[in-house]
Amino acid sequence: MIESTTSHQDFQQRSMTGYALEHPSYRIRGALFRHQDDGRLLSGCGGDIEVIHALELERSQHTCLPVRVTNVVVFGSNDVVRLIQPIEGTEDVIVNGDYHVSIVQSVELFESSTVSKSRILKLPGKIIAVNAEKHSNTELLLVFLLETGIFHYSFCAHTSTHFQCIQAFRCNRPITSGLLWRDSGLLHVAYYDGFVRVGVVHEQYDDMLLVKRVAVNRNNLSVLLDVVFEEIGRIQKFEDTEKQRREDMLTTSKSLSDKLVAEEEVVEGDTTNDDFAKLKIEFKNQSIRCERVSQRLTSLRKLITIIKSALDMNDQIEQMISLLVDELSELEKLEQLCKEVERTGNQNLIGKSWIAVEEKQMVVEELIAKVNSDQIKKHSDVWEQKIDQIIDQLNGCSEAAKDMRLIISQNIFEHRGDKKDVFTHFVLDAQSRDITLYCLSGLTTMAIYPRKGKRVASISLDASFATCLTAACAMKSAEGVYVADQNNVFPTYFYRNRPKAGKGEKRYLDAGNQLQLPTFDSISSILVEPHQMILGSVTGGLLHLSFDFASNYEHFVVASSILAHPISSGSVNCIKLLATGESLLALHCTDTEIVVSEKDQERWHRVTHHTGGAHAIAVTPFSVDERGAFAVVASDTFVRLKVLQYAEESLIGLHDLGESRAEDENGHPIEVLNVSLDPSMQYRQLPCKLRYAVGFADKAIRTYVALLTGQHDFNVQEKFIAQIEPLFNVQNMICFHGRPMGCYVSCAKTLQIWNDLDRHQQKKLKSERMQLLKLSSSVTSMERAEGYLLLGFADDRLSIYEEKGNGAVDLVGTVDDWHKGLNDRIVMSLRTRASKTSCGTRLFIHSLTAHHIVIHTVLVTASKIEQHDFIVAHEHSMSQPIGFEFVSYKYFEFLVYGRGISNEKLSIEDRKRMDNFRDFEFN
């Protein structure tokens, strides 16, 4: 029935340029933007953009089927898309993350593509706000409000280096939030650095043009010299103008002072004080301009000096080259003469002629050596370094940081709130009758008229209702603003009172009731349109809401549809994959819930969940025969035991079997850090026993044996406490086969091995069963595979230890320079596949970095590393990952998790590289 009702839409969609049947990803949606030309929805998804066609949106809303998207790779794992904005006068968009920005062309939004790295710029600080405008057909002016100040960049499409910093104002107080916009051509800024301030930024386009001309002609000395002298002439004219302007301002100031002293009473309507305020702004602007001009003049003088030295060096090089050309021509003449002498047959003349040729060749070789010497290369490097320093001095990047109030040429508004009242969002409503700026915090909403420079209205909540805002957006059908925290969306309406006779219009803010949302994920972005809203979530969810058309103020939700299903509610803390033989299950946890998901082709479906957050999971292998698995889930101060099983042929159930906790001497619960299961544990029919170990924050590992009865209460017996005195905390913990269970535990530069943790004799805490290893670097990750223990270190090393079966381990070897030239140093989140061969044990070791999955192979023979090879560093798409897991039965597929999940696959070439090291044997 669905196919019949939507077949005409499918035909239209398939005929569209670049239409792709791709499933949406499960990464954080930090930005939503509706393209005005054709109604496409652009959604930031991690570091990429997902484009959803308007017909696809309509189809999903009517059928409740997940949308299909076109994916455009922008930042990948390097950043998260935070904002998508149109570039006025073009069909292109500018995309920014926390530290990166990119220009994305409209044609790239039709096809699944990757943005060129040359169009991606990394900024020197965290990006707070961006403003972009078109200057010509090939050039854009980009303004960035960073945590460290305001930076102007030029983007030129015709140069190899597209981006160039042309003006910078560095501030001495970190800016945490803000907004940039243009009104009547003037650049306005609103920001929060402990104070809420709104003002106009003074822009000097002539200064920007100078920096751009110097950067473009940096290797053309003659043109560069003309640029410098032209600028010096302009500065001299500027100095004359500023001197006259300062004299006029001093005259005006003196006359105003005399007027104020002479008048005892203030006359109504007198604008003297306003004139003083304007004069103050003029003096400040002139001070800023004059300071910049003096610094620029000093930089230009330096530039003239280095140009002169460069010209001298160029003259020397040209002289050597001309001399070399002369010597080469003489050498050719000598060779021709030698050939003529050979025809005479006079051996004496032949010998003398060839001696002359060899001498001339030696002279030529010496000249070539001089021309190709390191001195010329050094001169070129020094020139590049000096010209970069001059450009930084001209654009202001090398200037000392100053107060932001000195950067703003005209201060429009200032507000000092409570220190606990931190403003996190600024929203500009340019569609209202009077342009309105909303300043938002978790407690306060202020409405400001920037053109009038005054606060019109404000509203504050009680401190008990304080929340952390994650998104904000201006209303479309009425005046006001929507704010969102992780769980809810709240409207704040901006009302007008009808003016009474003789009184002006009064405006006020009023908080409305929160929207009634269906069960959803943590909200990360919001897009408001007339009578509808779209919400983005942390793990890839998209929720569409339709409002009642009858009222512009009471926004009742009359319909909702999930355009893309989130994988969970909040960031994924831990995930375990279970292969059932028919499908793939994922048991994962967040701060608020524990979820079981099932994979169907490339899409994950939530099957069931339990409320209550967790941060670590240990699980037994899935028993295909018994169709179930046990799980130990670590929460803040307790451990839950759960069973995952098929209740019927295809119905999956997650059952809570109870919980265990530990208390200190004062009866306070002890924080749980991590959990681990005895590797011999398997799923069996209840009742049965389950052995597991728990690492606590009181420097102790407690092991338990639980008698599971199938009821919510179960018998648990604390068998042994390993008090790890040399350590200050339990950082990594893995159980292994002991008598009957042992445990590896690490913290900082120490590794302990405990064996037989299931004994009752607690008197011998420091018996021969414990081994203590002091290491040279901090342990950052731990992995156990097929009788081997792998340790990753903070200094880019990995060590392999072999288990000896008596509660001890021996060092097999260490691999240095693990990341092979990558910027990452810490070896984190190890996963290993092992296979035994006649030659030894082959280990395929995978480690996770911020941007890559690094794969090595090691062959261990006779307790030694026989062979080690680096295979590949696969770049994943998850920004700020927490960990990763293997996909069962697929050696080339991984699941990376953090703020969402990302399914990663090795390319065909990378799989072939791995196959070169796979040992195929028939046993």
From Swiss-Prot:
Q: Which InterPro entries match?
A: WD40/YVTN_repeat-like_dom_sf, WD40_repeat_dom_sf
Q: Which residues form a coiled coil?
A: 312-347
- Disulfide bridges in this chain: none
Recorded hits in SUPFAM superfamilies, A to Z, give: WD40 repeat-like
- Entry keywords, A to Z: Coiled coil
Q: What does this protein do?
A: May have a role in tumor suppression.
This chain belongs to the protein called Protein dct-6
Q: Which gene encodes it?
A: dct-6
